[in-house]
A protein has these predicted regions:
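Active-site beta3 strand of CheY-like receiver
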Residues: 12, 51-57
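Acidic catalytic/metal-coordinating carboxylates
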Residues: 39-40, 65-70
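Short amphipathic alpha-helix used as the core "switch/output" element in two-component signaling
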Residues: 46, 68-79, 97
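Active-site residues of response regulator receiver
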Residues: 59, 87
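Receiver (REC) domain active-site loop signature in two-component systems and cognate sites
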Residues: 62
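C-terminal output helix
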Residues: 91-93, 107, 111-120, 166
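Conserved small/polar residues in nucleotide/adenosyl-binding loops
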Residues: 178-179
């Protein structure tokens, strides 16, 4: 992990227990991470920005909106922030469900600081990779939109793996006219 990635990332901790929030904040900040804590899923949704890189350390069972309900809401909003679930009451079915729904990890309490920090590092690396890939994809889309309609047709043929002659035949043009 680069120091730049770590300094830009924010680890969000959402847990209804203030002692747990303070404890995890102390451990995570002690390793040089930026940390924001939230007492509930609703507070997280109201105050957090999905545009800031990092990850979410999330308790499964909380009053009001549960961690699993928050995961579902984030998915509906298109928020791709990696989630690390922590639970004292989790079971295999719950862990499998959260992972199938996109969670990065599911840790059972008690969790060692080393295990949590390892999960955070992996999640933040994945988030950085996703954000880089998304930015590159958006640049490619923007470049494609700047092409003329005919150039877009040719580019689509190339993307489909067609040969120049095949593209020319499909578009009823000379292969020489666009190569």
């Amino acid at each position: 992990m680069t120091a730049n990635t770590q300094s830009q990332a924010i680890v969000r901790v959402v847990d209804d227990d203030p002692d747990v929030r303070r404890s995890w904040q102390f451990v995570i900040e002690g390793e040089g991470w930026n940390v924001l804590t939230y007492a509930s899923a609703l507070e997280f949704l109201e105050k957090d920005s999905p545009f800031t890189p990092g990850c979410l350390v999330l308790d499964v069972r909380m009053p009001g909106m549960s961690g699993i309900e928050l995961q579902h809401e984030m998915k509906l909003r298109g928020d791709t922030l990696p989630i690390i679930f922590i639970s004292a009451h989790g079971d295999i079915d719950m862990a499998v469900k959260t992972m199938k729904d996109g969670a990065d990890d599911f840790l059972s309490k008690p969790v060692t600081p080393e295990r949590l920090l390892d999960a955070i590092e992996k999640a933040v690396k994945r988030d950085a990779r996703i954000r880089t890939e998304s930015a590159a994809l958006e640049q490619a889309r923007a470049a494609f939109r700047r092409l003329s309609a005919r150039e877009q047709e040719v580019a689509t043929g190339v993307a489909r793996g067609l040969l120049n002659k095949q593209i020319a035949y499909e578009l009823n043009i000379s292969a020489v006219s666009y190569t």
